[in-house]
Each structure stands twice: as C-alpha cells, then as structure tokens.
C-alpha cells in the first residue's frame, strides 16, 4: 500500500515534466510522402511552408510594409511574405497584375503569410496579436496549435472538476455508505496518477492522450473497484473482514480479469496504428487498465481493511433500488427488438462509412476570436492553402512548362517560382544570393502554388491528386510536395488503412477473450454483434444529421466503445448463464434483467457522463467529437445490452447450448 501511494506521489509530480505534442503532423509515419517532403525542404531551405495568415485592415501600402517589418521581428516568425515579394511595388499598383495584387492587398486590407516555428506557437501568436491589435485578424495551423496548447490543460481540469462530483453522486446513489465512493476514487485515482507519471519514460505524449486517457481510465476501470467492494459487502454479513476480503478477491478475480482483458486487448489494438496518435493513446490506456487492475486487486483490499470501520460508520439507506422488475416487459419485446435491429444494422453499417469526415483539426467555433478571424480573412481574400513543390533545378525550360500546366489546374490561383517571378532568360547567378535563395537550394528549385481550396475535402484532395499526376508526368518520382492539404491527404490514406487493421484486431482479440471466458463458439458472436451494432448506430448518426465528423475521433471511438462497453454484455451474460443452469430460459432472462440492469446502468451512466462532459467542456474539435461519440455510444450500448442481447439469448438458446462446453442448462423433469 505504501508503495502505491509513493508511486502516485512521484507520478503526480513528474507528469508536469512530460512534454505534450500538439502537432498532428508529427504523428504521421516517417515514410509518408508529405513528411519526407517536409524533411527535405527543411534541410534545403531556411523557411518552411507558411502556416499562418495575418490580415490588417485600413492600411496603405507603406503602413502594410511597416506591419510586415514588425511581424518579421517577432521571435519564432520566419519568412513573412506580402505583395512586395511578388511584384515591384515601386510601380503603380494599377498597372500590375490585379489578380496578384488582390491576393495580398484588397480594399485597403493587407494579407501577410508567414511561418511560425514549431514549439514557439504560443509566444509568437501572442506577440502578433500585440502588434496587430484586436481589430485585425490571424488564422492558420500554427494558431490552432497555440490554442490547443493554451486550452487543453485548462479544459481537462474543467472536465475533471465537473466529472468527479457527478461520479461521486452516481456512486452515492448506488451504494450504502458515504465512504465507499472515497475508496473507489482513491484506488482508481492512485492508478491514474501512476500512469501519468510513467509517461516520463515514453518521452512525450499527444495532447489527445493528455486530455482523454486519464478520464477514460477512471471511467472504464471504476467497475473493477465497485465489483470487489460489493462482493466484500456481501461476505461481511457472515464473515470477518479479513475472511470476507479473501473471499471477495477470489470471487471477483475471474470477473475483473475477464472485464479488464477485453478492455486491455481492445485498447492494445490501437497501438498497431501507423498514425501514431492512436498508438500513443492506446499505450496510455493499456498502461492505465493494467495499473487499475493491480490497484484494485492489491491496493484496494489493503485500503479497505484499514478503513472498513468508516464504511460501517457512514452507512445510509440505499436511495435507489438495485432490482427493477422490468424483465417481463423486456422479454415481450424480444421479437420486435430483433426485427428493429435487423432493419437498422445494414443502413447503420453503410452510413457510418459514408459520413463527411474531417482529417485535420476541424474549424474553430464561430464564437471564438480564432473562428471569427478565420471567417473574416476568408470573406476578404477567399480560401488559401499553399502547396510547395521541390523539383530538380537543372532544367528551367522544363520547370516553366510544368508551372504553366499547374497554373491551368482548377483552384490554383497563382504560382510563385523563378520562371514566373524572374524568367528563364535571366540566369540565376545574376541575382543576389538572398533573392536566389528564395527559389533555389543546392539541389532543388522551389515552386509555391497558391490555391483556393480548403485544407481538406473533395476539392482539396482532388487537387492534390491532380498536382501529383502533373508532377509525375514531368519528373516521375523525383519531386517532393508538401503543404497542409498534402499532409491531410496522407493522413487520410494512413488512418483509413489503420481503421481496417485495428477493427479486425480488436474484434479478434475480444472474441478470443470471450471464447476463453464462456467456453463457447456462439457467445463471442452474440456479444460482439450486440456491441458492434451499437458502435455502427453511434457512428451513423453524423451521416443522418449531416454533420462532419473528425476521423481520428471516429477511429478511436470505434475501438474504445467496443472495448469499454463489451463488459456490460459480459456481466449480463455471465449472470444469465448461471441462472440458466437453475431455471428455464424465460425465467432466467427475466431474473437477469431485473438484477443486472442496475449495476450495468451505474457503469453506463459513469462512462456516458465522461463522454458528455468532455463534449461540453472542450473547444478542441477532436476531443469534443470523442466526447459526444463516447457519451452517445455508451447509452446505445446499454440499450442494446438490456433489450437486444436478451432477445438473442432467448431466441438462440438452443444453438448457444449446443456450441458451449458443458453449459449444464436447466431441463424440465
């Protein structure tokens, strides 16, 4: 017990030294084309792809140049580009190419593009706000990263501040002692703190793991502690505290092990993702489940035996009944339930794959400055997503033809390269070195496409494929392309492949645990069908409501919901199988529903509360989407377990008996 407390204290302290990574791009595989291109560009050129746009209103050209100089002087800001980098502003703007002019300067509004160094997003964006004031605007990927850094920790704290009282209330309503919730939360809280501390050995964690893993660990593993203490309470009626705890541990160990195993192996599947945010979250959750299991089976018994007198002194009447006589009613619904699910399951499966997915961070809410600024810049200058290409610098004639063809592509507004800005008639050696370095490195020539698509979506990804096709025609595989749309295109390819892999791994792993637990060939099919249908229904909702869904949230929840809520089906089915040995199937299912709906309801209410609180407290689109999917998915899983699963167990009673080793089902004499 002392060791657990000591480790928890150490974990609580060292967690603040664990770096948090807020960049989704860093979690792409190293061999992703856009990642390789970014690495090459950083080696060859001093500046990277522009990741921020700043708009200043009501300024002259000279005033805009002054703003440009002030912004460029900020630490962490590189390569500020404006109109003077595209044309000679000493000549009247009226005689210049108006499309080029209006890309940077329009209706007395100046639009700058710049790159903010990774790791300096927060101080740099704050300094830019100081320079431009509250009436001007800033948007871009670097700003989104800065917002995540500033808000994630505070929003996680806010979620915990709401969640813990809610969980305590649920536990108080479902137990008979004021002190028992303290034991539950202490045992799991200790394991959460240890888990946070062990991240120091990983090196860094993603902001998603920081936000989601501790809360999810708490919600999923509270069941283990509840089951142990409820067993302890039962044995206390006849045995001494020490003997009661031994019997409770013996009784609880198989059930808690089975429950933890399904969750453990489900979360373990996430670690096989190539998109390493999933692997990062999976590792954190796997560690969390293992530590929670150890805490419940080692730390909680010792803590309970020390403090059981406080349980006795703080007894109160049970405010909610633990039996609900609804089994007879639910049993009558078995055929309608089966028919309804049969009608829903195929459309739900198809719809959940056809949702409008977002692969990046999504848009900032309109009620935030970032969201309003983004809209203001789009309204004034339109959409802007730069694409950067690196090609062999030895053949300017070929490059000129290449750029001309790129310029003809839909959504390409303008291009910036040597052949367009200077011309093939002037040798690069005639330019000053500082000017030449804007276009050439030692090995490559740089071409920038200013496009008018969003960073992702059908139009953006179609343009990516068109650019790839044109580049391949001119340079084969000897080119590099990057930019946010290219990065998100790669992310889409990676996570879609991950989705196929981890879903198969999750189902196979959980099916194996269920096969061992129930010694039955049919039970894994019955239980996984029940929960997987709830998963498909949950993920189909955004399609029918026409709401975009962040794909990483979709992918994580498709695994987490199955792994976390299959425990409800296990608990229900174990009790049913025991009852079925003593009575006919209808009596067994009614008794199981009456007795288990309360305990399953407590678990589901805690997990769904976690989801809805994450949804309500987070402004991050990824965290928020995980929250709403978890909350809604848990309620759907609960509904399926108490209505659809009983129907399956009753209707397929004979096949279950024949495919189960020694079921010992009750036979009428």
Q: Where are the regions a protein language model picked out?
A:
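Membrane-embedded transmembrane helical bundles of large multi-pass transporters/channels
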Residues: 1-20, 119-357, 472-669
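Structured non-transmembrane domains adjacent to transmembrane bundles in polytopic membrane proteins
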Residues: 30-52, 56-142, 356, 362-523, ...
């Amino acid at each position: 017990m002392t060791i657990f407390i000591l480790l928890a204290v150490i974990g609580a302290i060292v967690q603040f030294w664990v770096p948090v990574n807020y960049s989704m791009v860093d979690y792409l595989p190293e061999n992703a084309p856009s990642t390789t291109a970014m690495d090459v560009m950083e080696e060859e050129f001093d500046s990277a792809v522009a990741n921020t746009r700043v708009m200043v209103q009501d300024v002259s050209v000279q005033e805009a140049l002054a703003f440009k100089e002030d912004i460029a002087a900020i630490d962490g800001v590189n390569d500020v580009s404006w109109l003077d980098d595209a044309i000679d502003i000493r000549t009247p703007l009226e005689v210049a190419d108006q499309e080029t002019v209006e890309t940077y300067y329009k209706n007395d509004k100046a639009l700058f593009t710049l790159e903010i160094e990774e790791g300096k997003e927060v101080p740099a964006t704050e300094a830019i706000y100081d320079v431009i004031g509250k009436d001007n605007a800033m948007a871009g990927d670097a700003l989104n990263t800065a917002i995540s850094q500033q808000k994630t920790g505070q929003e996680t704290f806010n979620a915990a501040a709401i969640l813990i009282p809610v969980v305590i209330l649920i536990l108080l309503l479902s137990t008979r002692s004021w002190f028992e919730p303290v034991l539950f939360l202490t045992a799991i809280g200790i394991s959460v703190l240890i888990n946070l501390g062990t991240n120091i050995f990983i090196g860094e964690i993603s902001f998603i793991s920081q936000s989601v893993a501790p809360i999810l660990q708490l919600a999923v593993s509270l069941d283990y502690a509840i089951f142990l203490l409820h067993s302890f309470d039962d044995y206390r009626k006849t045995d001494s505290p020490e003997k009661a705890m031994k019997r409770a541990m013996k009784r609880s160990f198989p059930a808690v092990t089975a429950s933890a195993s399904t969750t453990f192996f489900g979360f373990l599947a996430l670690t096989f993702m190539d998109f390493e945010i999933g692997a990062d979250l999976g590792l954190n959750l796997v560690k969390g489940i293992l530590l929670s299991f150890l805490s419940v089976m080692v730390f909680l018994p010792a803590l309970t035996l020390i403090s059981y007198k406080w349980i006795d002194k703080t007894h109160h009447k049970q405010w909610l009944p633990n039996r609900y006589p609804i089994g007879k009613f639910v049993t009558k619904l078995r055929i309608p339930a089966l028919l309804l699910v049969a009608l829903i399951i195929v459309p739900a499966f198809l719809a959940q794959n056809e949702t409008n997915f977002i692969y990046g961070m999504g848009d900032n809410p309109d009620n935030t400055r970032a969201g309003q600024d983004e809209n203001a810049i789009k309204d004034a200058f339109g959409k802007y997503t730069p694409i950067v290409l690196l090609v062999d610098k030895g053949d300017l004639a070929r490059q000129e033809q290449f750029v001309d063809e790129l310029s003809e592509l839909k959504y390409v507004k303008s291009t910036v390269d040597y052949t367009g800005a200077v011309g093939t008639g002037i040798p690069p050696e005639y330019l000053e070195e500082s000017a030449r370095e804007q276009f050439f490195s030692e090995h490559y020539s740089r071409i920038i496409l200013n496009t008018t698509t969003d960073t992702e979506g059908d139009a953006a990804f179609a343009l990516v494929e068109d650019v790839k096709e044109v580049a391949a025609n001119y340079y084969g595989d000897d080119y590099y392309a990057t930019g946010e749309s290219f990065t998100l295109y790669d992310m889409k390819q990676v996570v879609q492949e991950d989705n196929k892999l981890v879903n198969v791994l999750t189902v196979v792993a959980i099916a194996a645990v269920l096969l061992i637990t129930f010694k039955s060939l049919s039970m894994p099919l019955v239980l996984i069908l029940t929960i997987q249908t709830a998963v498909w229904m949950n993920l189909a909702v955004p399609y029918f409501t026409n709401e975009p869904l962040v794909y990483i949230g979709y992918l994580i929840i498709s695994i987490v919901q199955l792994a976390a809520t299959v425990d409800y089906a296990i608990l229900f089915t174990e009790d049913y199988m025991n009852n079925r040995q003593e009575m006919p199937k209808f009596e067994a299912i009614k008794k199981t529903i009456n007795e288990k709906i309360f305990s399953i309801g407590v678990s589901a209410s805690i997990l769904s509360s976690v989801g809805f609180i994450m949804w309500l407290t987070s402004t991050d689109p990824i965290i928020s989407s995980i929250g709403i999917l978890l909350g809604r998915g848990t309620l759907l899983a609960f509904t399926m377990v108490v209505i659809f699963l009983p129907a399956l167990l009753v209707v397929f009673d004979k096949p279950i008996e024949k495919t189960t080793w020694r079921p010992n089902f009750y036979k009428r004499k």
